[in-house]
Amino acid sequence: MCSSDLDRVCCVGGIPQSGQLDTVLVVDVDEEFESVIGHEEDMLPNGVSAEALERLTAIATDLALTGREGKSIGAMFILGDHEEVYKRSKQLILNPFHGYQDEDRNILNPFMDETIKELSLIDGAFIVRGNGVVETAGSLIQAKADNIVLPGGLGTRHAAAAAITHATNSIALVVSSSGQVTYFRKGRMFTLFEKSAGRAF
């Protein structure tokens, strides 16, 4: 996490699978995010580890890029404040993670990648603790979307992600079937990756 008002992030990227880097972007963190989210300490909620967010972002980006079984899919991951998130959700299926040890259902465990990708085929959100432990999958988010304004053309996943991050101290990552990954914090959205553009933002 950034530690001062002078922090800058250097991003280097290119078209996936091209083997070439063609874009360099330097971002002034304070200037870029404070006007949208607030103070920089609000960017990562209390109790959410940077490692868990980084891993979840990698999984979401991979899903956006490759889909599952040759098909484009959509998915939603909610990270942090899991108890409050859970109060505003309803299971659509029996919880596939019930009864497993924490270390066996943590997204930081590389063996979880295939499980997460497979369960992304079902409707509903993944609810994930701030430390990366997956609480449940297949959850219907029932937070109210009052006073949430989103660009036209976005679906129910985006509306639910905006609403739940507005109502709780969480982060949401949404993968759309068009191959876009969007980050939500405090009801606001930021596009992280778009398959059609072939690069991260």
Question: Which residue ranges define each predicted feature?
Answer:
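Short, small-residue-biased leader/transition segments that mark boundaries at the very start
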Residues: 1-3
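Short beta-strand segments
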Residues: 10-14, 78-80, 128-129, 175-176
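Conserved mixed alpha/beta catalytic, RNA-binding, or beta-rich assembly cores of soluble enzyme
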Residues: 23-158
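Acidic, PIN/NYN-like endoribonuclease modules and their adjacent C-terminal/linker elements
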Residues: 190-201
